[in-house]
Structure formats: C-alpha cells, structure tokens
C-alpha cells in the first residue's frame, strides 16, 4: 500500500505516543489511525498497526499535525493535506459502527465530549460534574463572606450573590482556558487532561496571588456609584444582572467554541445597566476609555511580540550552524525571563526595589539552571550527537532576519522540538498564572461590590472594599470548575483553527501573550486575555506569511467580539428589570 504521507517516526516515537493522535512506531513502520468521526479528539486510544495487518478497519488515515511531520512540511514548504480514507470492503459495517458511535454520543449528551477529552467514561464525567455542582451549592454555606449575624433574608441574598459570582467564574474557565492551554494542545505539547490539570493549579494560584490588582478597577472604575446614592438595591440588582448577563453570553459562546472576551462581557454588561438605569453620568468614562483602549492595544502588542519572538527563533535557532545546540542555549534565557517576571509581579518579598529586583533575579537564575539540567538529562544523548562537525554540515547558513528558512531536519529537528516542547509547557504555565490573576476580577469585582452593598449598605464607590481571601478562592474554584467541565470546547479554536501550530510557534504565541497579560495585570488594567492570545497566534501566522492565517476563522472570531458588548448590555438591562421585581417582592 503506497501512502502519500511522510512521517517523522523518530520524533513521534519519542514524544507523541502519549500526547497526540499521530505516531508511527519505529519498529513496525506503522501508521497512525484516528476515528473517522473525530478530527480533534480521539474516541479511543490511537492504534498502532503494521501495514500488513488490519487494512480493512473502518478508520481514516490522517496526515499528522504539522508540528511533528517532517520539518520541511511544517515550516514553509507546501503541505499535502488531502485525507485519504482507507478503502474498506465492508462499507456497510463502517456505516453501522459510525452510527452506533454517534448514537452513544447523543445519548450521553455533553458528558461524551468531556469523556472524550479526558479519555474517561461518560459515567465518570457525569460523576465529576455532579461533585462540582454539589460543591458549588454547599461551599458558600461555610464561607465567612456569607455574613455573620445578619438577617436570614440577607444571608439568602448573599448566598445567591456568591452563586452568581461562581456562575460567571465558571464561564470564564469554560471559555478562557484556551487562552492559556489552547496552543499547547494544538501543537501536541500537552494532552487535554494534562492541560486542564496544569491550568487548574496555576489559574487558582494566579487568582489568589494577583486577583486583587485588577479587581479594584472592576469594582470602582466602571460605574459612578454616587449616582445610585439611596438606590443601593438597584445597584445591587445591576451588579447581579451584569454577572448573569456576562455568564449567559459566555456560555453560549463556549457552546459554539467562540473565544470571546470575558472582559468585554462584564464591562459591556455593567455599562449597559449604568446607561439605562443611571444615565450617562453613571459611567466612569475616563476609566472606561483607558480600559477600552487596552482592548485595542493588547492584540496588537500580542501579535507584535509573538512575531518578533518567532522571527528570533527562526533567525537565531533555525538558521544557526547547529540548531539543536542553539535551542539548548536559548531555552534557559527564556526561562529566566519568565520566572523572574512572575516572581517580581506576583511574589515580591519587599516593596524596596533593590530587594525585589534581587529576588526576581535569583528566582530567574534558579529556574534557568533547573531547566538547563532537565534538558541535558532528557536530551543529552541527542545533543552529544550534534557536536560532531558532520552533523551541522548540511544546515542552512544565516541569511537575514525576515527570510524564510528551511530549517533543521533529523536529529537536529528532534532536539529543537524537544526543547521547545518543554518550553511551551512552561509558557503555558506562565500564561495560566497571568490569566488567573487578570480575568478572575471579571467575576470577583462585581461580586465583592454586590456583597458590600448588601451587607454594609454602602455603595461600591463610597469606601474602600477589602476583598476577602475566601472570595478570591471562590472565584478561582469557579474558573477551575468551568475549565474542567467545558474548557475543551474552545481549545480547538485557539489551538487548531487560526493557524497550524508547532512547539516553536506555540511557545512564541504563549510567551508573548503571557508577557502582555502579566504586565497589564501588574498595572491593574483588565485587558482581554482572549484578544491578546488570538493576536499572538495571528502574529506567529503572519511571521510565516499571510496565507498561513485562516481568514475565515479570524472573521468568525472578530464577529463574535463585535457582538459581545451590545449583547451583554442588552441582557443586563433585561435581567436588571427582572431582578428588581424579584427584590421588591422579597424585601
């Protein structure tokens, strides 16, 4: 059987047997088969078959991801992506099997998607969802923020407020986990399960350690609370409506796989409520202008930084006489920058600049040393091969910063992708932490303000609101719950549909986006992590040429961005009318 595909068996065997649905065993010279009905997720574990056997299975041969096919295929030469279905003499059996699979998926509902993403049974997926729902309903009872010594009605309203905040945080996790992990999954560096587990820890940590920086802007930087003096219940209803409206639109977007901006959702909802129920004077226009400008600047910055990072990789790694050694030398530098940035932004031991700088530098150096040793341990045998003069004879010469470089092959390619595979995992962690610190404010800001109004009888802008640690933890838990149950839906759009990603491209996009988001979080700007990441992925695509960016996907994403603010504002106005009627009846 002659196949028009070229597989990189060495690379696939060493890294991808456990992380993706493409491989060819080195010993059997086999082919990778994936279930025909699933272009992104595997329904069953990948089967590794020799060409002499099982040629009549109801499966389709899938061209491997560009990231782990030959380097020439993945880095600039024309790719042949025509999927060739294997001819099966038992066609009726094939149709029957596919119909049964679809029927089972429909029978299990959304749990089938979660089960496929994590490679677990639908029963297990349902059990996980039930545990999360039960925890969401019971944990608020034990939170201090529920209110101590308050009337029963106030406690019940506080309980409902915490649930609204959880709903918003849940949808942030469901939609925005792709900002941190989509490129890693798209390039094959992480599986869905690994991505979600990693994001869960780091999103929660970022929310706890950096959530207060942006939350204050969401509390007091959007609405002029003094306009609602004497109308505390109206403002309270408006804040709840903003959470409900933003959460509703995010859930719709997540269902269809649109990576919309959670920041757009919540800000649009709050502004819509303010304009209708408080007039133009209810909106803090100067602060809103600063926030809105960041929405335009952030994707541009993300695209620019990722473009430069990827061009630097191509210039200083791909075109180096020994790309493997060049990648091994560049990796600790990138790790140093990332670790030092997180240390100074999130965990400063002192506000005195020399001490904080020394701490950041020490953490960065330690991280770089540890990462260098990991690389030497895992890839040392391959790096030793590349030290011989014969290995680098056929490598391309240095030919300019913006040129199209053919790139390394063979052992050199394996080393470069191996190193950048590790680096992309670290950049995904970097992005998860930054995203948790920035986007948890979209749920916690209105939630904390609503609790303050309800329990203290003061408008959000009247006094400084201290954000309790349990409220930050509650928001972090909501994000983790959302990314666990629905996060896989949007990952496909970020990781697959904008441009083809490899570990080097994915690293460039994630590193650029995380840097921009972390810097904005430190300044207290609620920028759109979604805009930043999509811009960064597009920047990598532009670095490869305009034809490398899928215009249809970009148009669909931009269209969903444009309708987010008016939809959020409209829903907030409707929900406010409903909630004011309910509150007038209850109180």
From Swiss-Prot:
UniProt-listed InterPro entries: Phos_transporter (IPR001204)
Pfam families cross-referenced by the UniProt entry: PHO4
Disordered: region residues: 74-106
Subcellular localization: Plastid, Chloroplast inner membrane
Keyword Repressor: no
The keyword Kinase is assigned to this record: no
Keywords: Chloroplast, Membrane, Phosphate transport, Plastid, Plastid inner membrane, Symport, Transit peptide, Transmembrane, Transmembrane helix, Transport
Protein's GO biological process: phosphate ion transport
Transit peptide: 1-71
Topology term for the membrane: Multi-pass membrane protein
Residue spans of biased composition, Polar residues class: 85-98
Domain of life: Eukaryota
Residue intervals passing through the bilayer: 127-147, 154-174, 195-215, 233-253, 265-285, 289-309, 327-347, 352-372, 413-433, 465-485, 523-543, 559-579
GO molecular function: low-affinity phosphate transmembrane transporter activity; symporter activity
Induction entry: Induction by light is inhibited by abscisic acid (ABA) and cycloheximide.
Gene Ontology CC terms, in alphabetical order: chloroplast; chloroplast envelope; chloroplast inner membrane; cytosol
Tissue-wise expression: Mostly expressed in young green tissues. Present in both auto- and heterotrophic tissues. Also expressed in root stele.
PANTHER family according to UniProt: PHOSPHATE TRANSPORTER (PTHR11101:SF80)
Reported function: Low affinity H(+)/Pi chloroplastic cotransporter. Involved in inorganic phosphate (orthophosphate, Pi) uptake in green parts of plants in Pi-sufficient conditions. Required for Pi retranslocation during Pi deprivation.
Similarity comment text for this entry: Belongs to the inorganic phosphate transporter (PiT) (TC 2.A.20.2) family.
Name of the protein this chain belongs to: Inorganic phosphate transporter 2-1, chloroplastic
């Amino acid at each position: 059987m002659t196949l028009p595909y070229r597989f990189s068996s060495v690379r696939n065997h060493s890294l991808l047997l456990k992380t993706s649905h493409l491989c060819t065993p080195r010993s059997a010279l086999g082919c990778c088969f994936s279930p025909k009905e699933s272009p992104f997720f595997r329904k069953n574990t990948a089967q590794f078959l020799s060409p002499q056997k099982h040629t009549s299975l109801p499966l389709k041969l899938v061209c491997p991801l560009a990231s782990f096919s030959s380097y020439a295929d993945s880095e600039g030469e024309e790719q042949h992506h025509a999927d060739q279905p294997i001819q099966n003499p038992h066609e009726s059996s094939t149709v029957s099997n596919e119909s049964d699979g679809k029927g089972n998926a429909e029978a299990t509902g959304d749990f089938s998607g979660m089960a496929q993403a994590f490679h677990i049974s639908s029963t297990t997926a349902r059990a996980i969802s039930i545990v999360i729902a039960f925890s969401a309903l019971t944990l608020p009872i034990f939170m201090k923020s529920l209110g101590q010594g308050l009337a029963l009605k106030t406690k019940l309203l506080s309980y409902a407020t915490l649930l609204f905040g959880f709903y918003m945080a849940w949808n942030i996790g469901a939609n925005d986990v792709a900002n941190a992990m989509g490129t890693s999954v798209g390039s094959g560096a992480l599986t869905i399960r690994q991505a979600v587990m990693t994001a869960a820890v780091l999103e929660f940590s970022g929310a706890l350690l950096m959530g207060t920086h942006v939350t204050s802007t969401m509390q007091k930087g959007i609405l002029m609370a003094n306009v609602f003096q004497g109308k505390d219940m109206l403002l309270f209803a408006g804040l709840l409506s903003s959470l409900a409206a933003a959460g509703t639109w995010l859930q719709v977007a997540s269902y269809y796989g649109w990576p919309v901006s959670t920041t757009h959702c919540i800000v649009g909802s709050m502004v819509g409520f303010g304009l209708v129920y408080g007039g133009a004077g209810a909106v803090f226009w100067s602060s809103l202008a600063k926030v809105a400008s960041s929405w335009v600047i952030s994707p541009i910055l993300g695209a620019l930084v990722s473009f430069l990072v990827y061009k630097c990789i191509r210039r200083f790694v791909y075109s180096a006489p020994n790309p493997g050694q060049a990648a091994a030398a560049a990796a600790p530098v990138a790790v140093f920058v990332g670790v030092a940035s997180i240390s100074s932004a999130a965990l400063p031991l002192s506000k005195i600049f020399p001490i904080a700088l020394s701490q950041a530098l020490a953490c960065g150096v330690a991280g770089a040393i540890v990462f260098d040793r990991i690389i030497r341990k895992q890839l040392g045998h391959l790096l030793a091969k590349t030290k011989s003069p014969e290995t680098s004879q056929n490598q391309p010469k240095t030919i300019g910063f913006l040129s199209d470089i053919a790139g390394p092959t063979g052992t050199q390619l394996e080393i470069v992708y191996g190193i950048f595979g590790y680096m992309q995992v670290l950049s995904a962690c970097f992005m998860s932490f930054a995203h948790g610190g920035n986007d948890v404010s979209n749920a916690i800001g209105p939630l904390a303000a609503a609790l303050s109004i309800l329990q203290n009888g003061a408008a959000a802008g009247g006094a400084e609101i201290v954000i309790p640690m349990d409220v930050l933890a509650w928001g972090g838990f909501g994000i983790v719950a959302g990314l666990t149950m629905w996060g896989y839906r949007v990952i496909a759009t970020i990781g697959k549909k904008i441009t083809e990603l490899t570990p080097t491209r994915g690293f460039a996009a994630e590193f650029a986006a995380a840097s921009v988001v972390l810097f904005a979080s430190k300044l207290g700007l609620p920028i759109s992590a979604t805009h930043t990441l999509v811009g960064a992925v597009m920047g990598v695509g532009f670095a490869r040429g305009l034809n490398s960016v899928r215009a249809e996907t970009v148009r669909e994403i931009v269209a969903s961005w444009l309708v987010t603010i008016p939809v959020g504002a409209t829903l907030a106005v409707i929900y406010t009318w409903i909630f004011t009627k309910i509150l007038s009846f209850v109180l």
